[in-house]
Amino acid sequence: MKKLTVAALAVTTLLSGSAFAHEAGEFFMRAGSATVRPTEGAGGTLGSLGGFSVTNNTQLGLTFTYMATDNIGVELLAATPFRHKIGTRATGDIATVHHLPPTLMAQWYFGDASSKFRPYVGAGINYTTFFDNGFNDHGKEAGLSDLSLKDSWGAAGQVGVDYLINRDWLVNMSVWYMDIDTTANYKLGGAQQHDSVRLDPWVFMFSAGYRF
């Protein structure tokens, strides 16, 4: 009887392991906090005002993943609009910009399909669209107006890990690096200006996921 009990427990463990699997054909969604942190030195120059910096911002991040095989996934990153303040040492904050950075990734999941712990890496492409950008009163007092930023295409890389709590739920930690370079168009003292802007942010996401 004891041997039968041990055997039954072993079979149950094996079955529960496979039930936790990331398997071909599965679809899952994650939601959590996503923080965009421009790299050190990110920013650019604003004519005679000199260099400027860009603040971090945290929003709701969403990822949608389809497992093409037990080890290959395709993921789309989405989020609520990120909001960054732009400032210079001389003037403080002078502008606010908003953007959305949808990113499509091809992923490789390490380990066995039945593992509860699935680290992965990914590579793909990022598209960033900028909107609702403008100078605040400090910027206008400095003679700045008519701010717009050009949309950007760039490469993206990713590392992350899923931990499967049960058949339906998981928790995730992931990090992206995105190549985001744009051009800022604006007026300074009524004269049209065009300056290059580099963001190249790290994106950190902590989330919970549900598998369908």
UniProtKB/Swiss-Prot annotation:
InterPro entries named among the record's database cross-references: OMP/PagP_b-brl (IPR011250), OMPW (IPR005618)
Predominant location category: membrane
Signal peptide (from-to): 1-21
GO biological process: transmembrane transport
Keyword Nucleus carried by entry: no
Origin: domain of life: Bacteria
Function: Acts as a receptor for colicin S4.
Protein name: Outer membrane protein W
